[in-house]
UniProtKB/Swiss-Prot annotation:
GO MF, any single term: DNA-binding transcription factor activity
Keyword set includes Ribonucleoprotein: no
Source species of the chain: Escherichia coli (strain K12)
Entry keywords, A to Z: DNA-binding, Repressor, Transcription, Transcription regulation
InterPro entries membership: Homeodomain-like_sf, HTH_AraC, HTH_AraC-typ_CS, Tscrpt_reg_AraC-type_HTH
Protein name: HTH-type transcriptional regulator AppY
Top-level taxon of the source organism: Bacteria
Gene name of this polypeptide: appY
Keyword Metal-binding: no
GO biological process, one term: response to X-ray
Length: 249
């Protein structure tokens, strides 16, 4: 399973019994469901439409949709969240767009999937739902950091948020071949590259947004990670873009 959760649009009402519990799926409602619930859903296009959401899309959702870190992470027991009155025309358009983009543009598909997740009004519940359904500590911690990359994160902050000891987190990350320091650096550097590529901020602002108090330290960290300074990286991007434009002309 490569996906974290699935978004389901209900075309016809039906009920499911899961773990001796009846779940009613009402027509024209939107659900975000766990893998366990997804595997119980009928394979019937006339009853429902499904879009699976992968880890990369979830992490982009945390960064791009101006989310706030949940004040408390609650263990997902239901396996789903329902949105009973979504804007139908927009939902239809998103599902159709995702279907078309699936074979043409992964970038566009990701953007449309992010818009689909944003349809759920209970944003904090959705954020918590996604994080509890991510199956690796690496992605879980990356997701938490992504809510506020500018914050000065420490391992104890993560431990308090997910009600787990620091030693257990270290062990789980070691088993996954990484560490908290590496995850924090990777998340900051990927975000820095994204901001620099957008050409919307000065290097000073990029450093601040990525959690660095010192611009010079950020520049050194960026060069150590990517092999070039932020300004040289941007020049390379511009050079590639100019080359593409000349080819098109």
């Amino acid at each position: 399973m490569d996906y974290v959760c699935s978004v389901v649009f209900i075309c016809q009402s039906f009920d499911l019994i899961i773990n001796r519990r009846v779940i009613s799926f009402k027509k024209n409602s939107l659900f975000i469901v766990s893998d366990k619930i997804r595997r119980e859903l009928p394979v019937c296009p006339s009853k429902l439409r499904i879009v699976d959401i992968d880890k990369k899309t979830c992490l982009s959702f945390f960064i791009d949709v101006n989310n706030e870190l949940p004040g408390k992470f609650t263990l997902d027991k239901n396996g789903y969240i329902a949105e009973e009155e979504p804007p139908l025309s927009l939902v239809f358009s998103l599902f159709e767009g995702i279907k078309i983009a699936d074979s043409h543009s992964l970038w566009l598909k990701e953007r449309l999937c992010i818009s689909l997740l944003a349809m759920f009004k209970k944003r904090e519940s959705v954020n918590s739902f996604i994080l509890t359904n991510i199956n690796t500590f690496t992605c879980k911690i990356t997701g938490i950091i992504s809510f506020n990359i500018e914050r000065q994160w420490h391992l104890k902050d993560i431990a308090e948020l997910i009600y787990t000891s620091e030693s257990l987190i270290k062990k789980r990350l070691r088993d996954e071949g990484t560490s908290f320091t590496e995850i924090l650096r990777d998340t900051r550097m990927r975000y820095a590259k994204k901001l620099i590529t957008s050409n919307s901020y000065s290097i000073n602002v990029v450093a601040q947004k990525c959690g660095y108090n010192s611009t010079s330290y950020f520049i050194c960290a960026f060069k150590d990670y990517y092999g070039v300074t932020p300004s040289h990286y941007f020049e390379k991007i511009i050079g590639v873009t100019d080359g593409i434009n000349k080819t098109i002309d």
